[in-house]
């Protein structure tokens, strides 16, 4: 009986210690603390990283996903070419902005790591990072607007269904053109 009580005590202490651990534990080894390796890769590749969810989830498809679904959406050759061009332009615009964001986050991280950060430097760095994040988000969102102008109403509905966004809400089915 004493062995069972000891085992229960050990388990209780272990679970308490595990619960006390920060959700950030393990992140201290990142090269840039604020960005995961996946986020860095996505920024380098010009990927959206959910930055255009306001558009995507409100009926404005993104060019990449439209291209992925081009056969099921029955895009015409002209539509496909226009959307391919949008996608390439978006990626070409977003990639250097993403690289800039990586550099800015790295510089901020270094200042904290070197303990050289000041209030003024912090304000300047975070302002620049915020501006760059806004540029990056805009670089993705605006291509959702343009993509919606290319698709027909039935293709917009089909896209929403294929992506799992279809709803009976009348607001979902109005034309975005």
Positions of the model-derived regions?
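N-terminal signal peptide c-region/cleavage motif recognized by signal peptidases
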Residues: 13-17
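Extended aliphatic helical segments
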Residues: 8-10, 66
């Amino acid at each position: 009986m004493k062995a069972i009580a000891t085992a229960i005590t050990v388990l209780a202490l272990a679970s308490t210690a595990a619960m006390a651990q920060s959700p950030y534990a393990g992140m201290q080894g990142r090269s840039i603390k604020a960005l995961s390796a996946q986020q860095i890769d996505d920024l380098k590749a010009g990927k959206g990283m959910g930055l255009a969810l306001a558009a995507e989830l409100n009926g404005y498809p993104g060019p990449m996903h439209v291209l992925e679904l081009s056969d099921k959406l029955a895009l015409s050759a002209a539509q496909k070419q226009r959307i391919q061009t949008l996608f390439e332009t978006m990626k070409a615009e977003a990639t250097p902005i993403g690289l800039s964001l990586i550099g800015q986050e790295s510089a901020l991280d270094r200042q904290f790591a070197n303990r050289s950060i000041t209030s003024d430097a912090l304000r300047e760095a975070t302002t620049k990072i915020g501006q760059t994040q806004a540029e990056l988000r805009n670089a993705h969102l605006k291509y959702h607007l343009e993509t919606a102008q290319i698709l027909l109403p039935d293709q917009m509905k089909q896209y929403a269904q294929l992506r799992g966004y279809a709803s009976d809400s009348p607001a979902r089915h109005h034309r975005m053109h």
